[in-house]
Amino acid sequence: YFDFLNQSNLEKEIGEALIFLFIDQIRDLKNANEPYPTSLRGINWVKFLSVHEIEKKSFDRYLYSQYRILLDQIEYHLLGNHLLENGFSLIFGGYYFKGSELYQKGKELVSIELREQILNDGAHFELSPMYHKILLQRLLDTYNLVKNNKDVYQDAIFEKLLRDTGKKMLSWLESITFSNGTTPRVNDSTEGISSESSELFDYAKRLGFEWELAELSDSGYRLFKGAAVELFVDYGKIGPSYIPGHAHSDTFSFILNYKGSPVIVDPGISTYNIGYRRQRERSTSSHNTVRYGKVDQSEVWGGFRVGRRAKAVITNESADSIKGYHCGYKRFGIYHQRVFNFNQTSITIEDNMVAKNQLLGKSSAYFHFHPGIEVKIEKNRILVDGCNLNFSGASSTRIKEYTYAHGYNDTEKAKLVEVIFRERLVTEITLNDVKAN
């Protein structure tokens, strides 16, 4: 992708040498000519060559040939963030080469896909905070390019689309960013890939963006904030329906931060390689929600595919509570209903397995703790640093080990609690050393 070209301490000569080396070895690089890496690499090369005012015909010839190939290989078959990246890159190529065909095609793609992919509350429709931040940065870069190069192309309508969409995306991002600056690691999200929220906010402000916090809606994500505790809940749908490749089987999962530190966490992702680890990281039991028997809510398979899927419905919500159900176990005649009630000193979670007929089998509720947190069990009570968990309706409770992913190929063992129940489970999380206002 050549993202390293954007490093402030990278010497111009080293960047040039690496570009030369890449061009020389391109025939041996199996995936380098795929449209997605070509798109990202093109943007990074244009930025690097422009910032350093490098004019080399060999670079330009190769880069232009790559853009001609990209024009014929736009990723209509993959759609989603790939198609937006194709469009953004073609716009950069159009400005760099003053090529109307590149620019017009890129503008067409971006105009159509922004309207398709950005939800009403500002979330990117793949519902991954990581990809949301990546695409927001790309949008800000494109807005910067369009705004400051009107001698090349000028389109007030397109500029306004970028500005208005950017405001919505910034608003959503601020609404789901924790006080410690991190974002929820839901669906395919992990650290060290995208820019931090604060970096994007600062960049947007330098470009003249102003935005207000909007109410979270379509994404299904909610973030409850107290003086010392933050509770993120996921009542979103598998999204989008026609390309759910980055979705997990995680309906009604949640994340709990206490005094700015993670306590109950999403285990995250460590690989995109299709296999056991990828399957496990997308499964219901790898999230803080309920699994009926040994069945996932949504049938994740093949690394990036989803079969039958849970559809979440929010039935009631307020400033400190949310209630809903999903149909992921409909084929067994069961609906899972989950209610969160939030206040400054405690959180109550009520799970009901609503059956049309007699309920057969048991369910498991999972609670994954951040590495380093000591977890102790006392009857139906869990003791951890910062909070206690009490369970009503549990058949049994046990502590298990799981693999927490700090990032790609970077994992660590941690503790989880599995609570077995039949029809109804009430979990009360009591926060220590917190006084009600």
Predicted regions located by residue number:
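Short alpha-helix boundary/capping segments
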Residues: 33, 38, 244, 248, ...
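Aromatic-lined, polymer-binding surfaces characteristic
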Residues: 1-166
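A residue-level signal for conserved active-site and pocket-lining positions in enzyme catalytic cores
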Residues: 4, 90, 173, 351, ...
